[in-house]
Amino acid sequence: MKKFCAILFSFVLIVVLALPAAAEGESAALSDTAPALTAPAAYVVNLDTNIVVYDKNSEVPLSAASLTKMMTTLLLLESYQDQLDSISLTAPSYIYDLIWEQSTNASTADIRRGETHSLRNLLYAMLLPSGNEAAYIVADYMGGGSIDNFVAMMNNEAAAIGCTSTTFVDPCGLNPNNITTARDAYLILRAL
């Protein structure tokens, strides 16, 4: 009986160990039939091995658009992660003028002039509905009342984490001169 159990256990062990290898080969075959990537650029990294598994135009500068909010989020969390509920900010009126100067159909979180919100709510407003006004409120606070100061902080942080082709000009991505690459976007998201 012991011999039978040992043989059965060995067989089960071999099957269990062989399944991942079989699945690995199968997924490689499936990738040949995957739909073509239509994005202008992509950069995929295996986070366990730090090996680039897919690269398409990863160094080509493109408009950062709302990915800009990821850098605003990174700076917010680096400085205030433990104070997200204890600090509340009031929306300054001038930020709405900045937003509407750039776009009349900008995405917002419907934060009104003069309303007060916690940093946590502003973070959610930036990330979920892509609220441009939330990014500007955070930038105003962190930049000491100056959006330009905050944008300088964004560009300094981008350089510090290894971004080589990224330039920010506003905290939310409305301005088309916010530029990044797929590789630099990966570095920003990895830092988060």
Which residues make up each language-model segment?
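Extracytoplasmic
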Residues: 184-192
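Sec-dependent N-terminal signal peptides of Gram-positive bacterial secreted proteins and lipoproteins
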Residues: 2-23
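Active-site-adjacent loops and short helices of periplasmic peptidoglycan-processing enzymes
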Residues: 23-183
